[in-house]
Amino acid sequence: MAKPSYVKFEVPKELAEKALQAVEIARDTGKIRKGTNETTKAVERGQAKLVIIAEDVDPEEIVAHLPPLCEEKEIPYIYVPSKKELGAAAGIEVAAASVAIIEPGKARDLVEEIAMKVKELMK
């Protein structure tokens, strides 16, 4: 299946899994924002350290604005394959189209590692 138009680069499976792990750790030891509205606000306010966007969002318009907004605000973002997995990592029982890590907590090193790898992928 073709990737949605908002997916601007391919994320290796192990890096996507690290992103989900970072969400879980930040959820427990830091602060996250769940859902596209909360994520968008966190990006606009410059609070987000890392934005995680699901690749299986339908309709695409729900999250299509996030990659360009993150680029404008110079906030790293990454894709994960499943909104269901992203919701579970965020600690909610429903799917999440996107999540923003505001305070990484104990995931600080992991978030920094992901951000550096994402910069490489975006070249």
UniProtKB/Swiss-Prot annotation:
Keywords for this protein: Cytoplasm, Ribonucleoprotein, Ribosomal protein, RNA-binding, rRNA processing, rRNA-binding, tRNA processing
UniProt-listed PROSITE patterns: RIBOSOMAL_L7AE
GO cellular component: cytoplasm; ribonucleoprotein complex; ribosome
Subcellular location: Cytoplasm
S-S bonds: none
One Pfam family this sequence matches: Ribosomal_L7Ae
SUPFAM superfamilies: L30e-like
Gene3D superfamilies the UniProt entry points to: 3.30.1330.30
GO molecular function terms attached to this record: ribonuclease P activity; rRNA binding; structural constituent of ribosome
GO biological process, one term: tRNA 5'-leader removal
HAMAP family: Ribosomal_eL8
Family recorded in the similarity comment: Belongs to the eukaryotic ribosomal protein eL8 family.
Binding partners and assembly: May be present in up to 3 copies per 70S ribosome. Part of the 50S ribosomal subunit, where it binds 23S rRNA at its canonical site near the L1 stalk, as well as a possible second 50S binding site near helix 25 and a possible third site on the beak of the 30S subunit. Component of box C/D small ribonucleoprotein (sRNP) particles that contain rpl7ae, FlpA and nop5, plus a guide RNA. These sRNP particles form homodimers, giving rise to an asymmetric holoenzyme. Probably part of the RNase P complex.
Known role: Multifunctional RNA-binding protein that recognizes the K-turn motif in ribosomal RNA, the RNA component of RNase P, box H/ACA, box C/D and box C'/D' sRNAs. Component of the 70S ribosome. Component of a box C/D small ribonucleoprotein (sRNP) particle that is involved in pre-rRNA and tRNA processing. Utilizes the methyl donor S-adenosyl-L-methionine to catalyze the site-specific 2'-hydroxyl methylation of ribose moieties in rRNA and tRNA. Site specificity is provided by a guide RNA that base pairs with the substrate.
Protein known as: Large ribosomal subunit protein eL8
Species of the source: Pyrococcus furiosus (strain ATCC 43587 / DSM 3638 / JCM 8422 / Vc1)
